[in-house]
Curated annotation (Swiss-Prot):
InterPro entries: Ppm1/Ppm2/Tcmp, SAM-dependent_MTases_sf, SAM_mthyl_Trfase_ML2640-like. This is Putative S-adenosyl-L-methionine-dependent methyltransferase ML2640. It comes from Mycobacterium leprae (strain TN). Belongs to the UPF0677 family. Exhibits S-adenosyl-L-methionine-dependent methyltransferase activity. Keywords: Methyltransferase, S-adenosyl-L-methionine, Transferase.
Amino acid sequence: MRTHDDTWDIKTSVGTTAVMVAAARAAETDRPDALIRDPYAKLLVTNTGAGALWEAMLDPSMVAKVEAIDAEAAAMVEHMRSYQAVRTNFFDTYFNNAVIDGIRQFVILASGLDSRAYRLDWPTGTTVYEIDQPKVLAYKSTTLAEHGVTPTADRREVPIDLRQDWPPALRSAGFDPSARTAWLAEGLLMYLPATAQDGLFTEIGGLSAVGSRIAVETSPLHGDEWREQMQLRFRRVSDALGFEQAVDVQELIYHDENRAVVADWLNRHGWRATAQSAPDEMRRVGRWGDGVPMADDKDAFAEFVTAHRL
């Protein structure tokens, strides 16, 4: 269970979810029709020691193996892989558009194993700030450096928990609140309580010059019964495949029904925001699959919100 002051490294708790996401990016990169290319994802996954389960997600035959056990669970695995690719592509495009607009200051909140500071083609003079737990940041930078990988921008680490007083740490790293900024909150909100989500956006607003922008992945809502069913199904699949399920992701998420609707909150607090549902974006790029549970429940899926500071 989560606590208000829990911490982690790349092999424990919330840290392992970054490995899961990187595994999905690695699997996508190996596809002939890949939406995104992340040449460092597989390296970051295989060096974590986070467990055989996440490394198994790199196996191109994994969906077929799961399907032999549980067809609906296999549809979920395929959906999650495609979702991560679509999400990554959406936010890559967001960053690229910010660059075209002349923004040169970027902040990735809870950056995990995000490799954009290394794999995107940044213009000279671009600074990318990454905020996350100290051990998570250290694992990524050390692993990539040991393999001769260097950032393509001025990458600056801000090793602090976002539940703490992080703005002073960001400023100390060189952040300029008078400059336009492009913020990214991807794969973050579900790991924050509702009040912490509001507090995070309030802090971001106070640091954002006019013309700044933000992109956010929202936190979908799932009922207790659905979560319990998914936990049982994936535990059964893991057992059948011989994998130890060291971390139950559902136990890491805050399921707050009173969480603010992100686009609405931003529109009320000095931003002009729009939202794109994840299923609509997946259909737009040809990655929505049949057989996804709860396909008709819009609240069961995230939104991708983008906003400009007024």
